[in-house]
Each structure stands twice: as C-alpha cells, then as structure tokens.
Amino acid sequence: MSEPMKVVIVGGVAAGPKAASKIIRLMPDADVTIVEKGRFLSYAGCGLPYYISGVVKEQKELMATPVGVVRDPVFFQNVKNVHVMNETEALEIDRASKCVRVREVVGSKESRLDYDKLVLATGASPFVPPIPKVDLNNIFSLHGVQDAEGIKAVLAEGKAQDVVIVGGGLIGVEVTEALVQRGCRVTMVEMLPQMLGILDWEIAKLVEQYMESHGVKVLTNTKVESFEGDGKVKAVVTGKVSLPADMVILAIGVRPNVQLAQVAGLEIGPTGAIKVDEHMRTSDPEIYAAGDCVESVDLLTGHPCYVPLGSTANKQGRVAAVNVCGGNECFPGVLGSTVCKVFDYCVARTGLTETAAREAGYEVVTALAPAPDIAHYMPEAKPLLLKLVADKASRRLLGAQAIGPGSGDKRIDVAAMAITAGLTLDQLANADLCYAPPYSPAMDNIITAANVARNKLDGHMVGVAPMEVCRMLEEKRNFVFLDVRSPAEYEEVRLPGSTLIPLGTLRGRLGELPSSKEIITFCKISLRGYEASLILKAAGFKKVRVMDGGVAMWPYEKLFPS
C-alpha cells in the first residue's frame, strides 16, 4: 500500500484553506498540513471594514462557517482532517530535499516538514511608505483581524474625531464609510489625480462627489510628506496643507509576499508576484502557488497582471488543489471584476477602462447610460449609471463600469460573462435576460447601454463626452449647448452655458437655432437629447452631437437656481 501524499500549504487565510479542503475531498487519505504565521485562520479579510463599523458584531463571525462554526485548528483537524500549525512561520524551502523549515512564532522552536507537493499561499502585505514618523501610534494599516482590533480600540476610547485615510483605493473607500458611521470626521488623501484608479476619471469623480456629500473631504493630487506627533499621531503634513489627525489609516495597496519563493529560486513575474502557469504551477513542478502572492493573466490583453482579490484567491486555491491531486484544471485569468459599497452606492467594474483600452491599442466606442435599475414606475426604482467600452473594429465588449444606488453588481456580472465569451454589442443587446418590473426594466440597463454604443457605431448618433463639453465651455467655443428638459427641471438644476428649449417645443422653435453652429443636445440622461438630435438632423442641421449621459453624468459643478 502506497504512502499517503504529503502536502504542505504555506498560508492559512484564503487560497490555502481552500486548497486544503479540496485536496481532502479529492484525496481523503492525503496528509495535509497548513502553516500559518498568524493566529487566525480562514477569515474574511474583506469583511474587516464592516467589523469596524459594527455591521458585523463579533470577530468570530469573520471566521465562521454559514452555520456559525469557527474555522480554528480544531475545526480543520476534526472536520477537514487537515493539520494546522498556526502562529508558525515558514522560513525556508529546500527544493532538493523537498522540505520546508518552519519556526514557531512563540518559543522559536524549529522543525522540518517534508512534502510531496507544496502549495504557496503566502498572500500579500500592506505597503507602508517610507514617510517620516510613520511608526507613530494610531497609524494603522487594515489587513488582518489584529489591525481591525487596534482601530476599534482607538475608536472605543472616543478620541478619534479626525481620521485621515492615506490612499483612495478600495480599502480606503470601504474603511472611510465605516469610520463615518462611527462618527469620525474623515479626510481621504490620494497622490494621483483621481481616487479609485480602477475606474475611468468621470466615474471616479462621481464617487468622489458622492463621498463629499456624506461629509468626507477628498484631496486628490496630494502627497503625504510626513506625520507629526509625540508618541501618537497628531497631524498629517502634505505638500498643500497640514491635516489634524487623531488616527491615520494607510490604504496604499498591498505587495505580494514572495520572499520565501524568491529565496528558493522560484521565478518571479514582471508584476513582482510569483509566476505560475494556468495550472497554478510555479517554475518548480512540485510547487504550486495561489492567491495574493501570484500574478494572473489579463483575459483581454494576455499580459501578466496583479489583481489581489479574495474571490480570485479561492478559485486559484481550488485549481491548485485539483492539480496537486493529479487533475488537469486551468485558471484562465481575470478581468479585474470588482464591486465596492460606498454608503448607499454600488460601484463596480470589469474588463478594461476606456483609458486602459486605448493604451492597449484599441480604437474604442463608449456608452454612458443612466437609467432606473428596475421599471421606473416601481417605488423601489433607483438610479444606476453604466459605462460600456467596446472595440470599434470587432464590436466586442471590452469593459463596463457602474455607479449608483441601483443594482450595479448584477449588470457588471453580466458584462463580465459577455467579455469572457467574446460577445459583441449586438449579441449583448439581444441577450435573453430576466424581466419583471420589480427586478429590471423591460430593456435592461446593460442592453440599453449596448444599444447606445451600437447607435454610435451605426451612425445614428454622434456622442461627445462631458469632459470634452467642459473643455469647450472653458475655451469659449462657439456652439449651442441645448438643454431639452422641462422648464421645471431647468429651474431645479442646470448646467453652465446651456440654452433651454424643451423637447416638446423643439420642432416649432427650430428657427431660434443657428444652422451654422454646432449644437450639442442633452437632458437628464440624454435619451431626450438623442431624440432632439434626430429632430435637428431631419431638419437639415449638420453639426449635431449628443452629450453622453446628460446631467446625470456631468462630473463638474452644476447650477442650482432655486
């Protein structure tokens, strides 16, 4: 009788436990050991902001099964038949002898673990910038359970009134909401021109405006130069201003933990993460890697990319496990599909942004399509703004972004599947999606957005981005900015430089418009703007464009006459 396969897994948070569980399901007699440097196992790191806010009441909920059983070493031993060595650090891989040298964090006792197959799930660590006095008390990163406990302890003292978030990415945005809910005054500082660099500028700007409406101060193009304080942080000094701070959260992203692999001579990819093939094998065929320590492949460009997400880590852990057990499963790559809760808004994206698509060499067409997320006459209807990016030549969908209180995740999931399948806008526009008034408009938002892009490609509509219109206004270009909304809407909010002719009166007032000038039409969402452009073209006007997305997608200052 052959000896059980020995599998050592380094890392016990996401990809590691997933791999261990799948290996035991496929090969019940396998000898599986998880080595985890920290105390806690298999916890939901993405849930930490909600633990800080109090939405998640107890720490154990983050590491429990759906029926409330905590996934601790006893659980893994009794339920999974997996041996766990937590609070134990993997020090060195001896590839020739196929063993891992480990040391207990408390007590420093060392031992050696032999393996037939090794899985590296070493994760990532928060990036801590080399800023003067970054080691002051009350300066935190948010990566693990202990970080969250430290933040909660400061909040419990009731003295963290002013909090500065350094970094405007996903972690920064999510923890900002948690801190506002705890009564803090929050300032977000982002070095780049926009927060949420995974979005196009105009979508990120709408997120910024929405956060500011909830009392958050957002400073972009602002670099932190130092921290001030005697023992505890008291201020954050930027190149523009000094900000009072009782607490600071560093949310500048993570870096893959690759030192163990690198010292062992495993290949590191161009992103700085461990290079793996589609089977999650490293450059050593006996060693697999998965999760935040590895790089992936962008499904659209084919280039290596680093997109650390818990969802990806679990999928990769499963693929690695199947192949450890002799299977032939592949992980094809990622689209960077992401969703984020920002107060009452859903912000989501997948695939390439317009900027990334152009940088990748695509000639693109875009669609901005705001609309209610369900039938407009239903009382539960909420606004949702969609942006689609497609390739002009092939008409294939390349990317999608969503923002608003409506169900954006649903539409972005559809977009992710459409991109993965290589669907064109024409195929997406005729997709047989579910419809009932409480759940969707008759023409779903993503179908409408696809049709907007198709209208552009087919010559029925010429669009112009709000950013370009803003530049034209600033440069005092000679054009007519035609608002075709109702007088009541115009009195409620208007855009600078606009002229009002309601759509219902346009046919009778064509003589008021100069045929020699360009006319850019718009309304609340530019559906009426599109109708107006068709009326103008039919009347012989040659220079007519529609502002994409209308007032709803205008990311600049608006006028409120009332």
What positions do the PLM features span?
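Rossmann-like dinucleotide-binding cores of NAD(P)H-dependent redox enzymes
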Residues: 162-163, 170-228, 307-313, 329-356, ...
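Rhodanese-like catalytic fold shared by cysteine-dependent sulfurtransferases
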Residues: 426-479, 487-520, 524-562
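FAD-site-proximal beta/loop scaffold in flavoenzymes
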Residues: 135-159, 228-235, 239-322, 414, ...
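Hydrophobic/small residue at the entry helix of a nucleotide-binding pocket
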Residues: 14-15, 171, 528
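Beta1-alpha1 glycine-rich phosphate/pyrophosphate-binding loop at the start
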Residues: 2-85, 127, 177-199, 337, ...
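A Rossmann-like FAD-binding core segment of flavoenzymes
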Residues: 29-33, 85-106, 113, 180-276, ...
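Glycine-rich dinucleotide-binding loop and its adjacent helix/turn
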Residues: 120-182, 217, 276-278, 499-509
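Mid-to-C-terminal Rossmann-like scaffold of FAD/NAD(P)H-dependent oxidoreductases
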Residues: 2-6, 12, 293-406, 437-441, ...
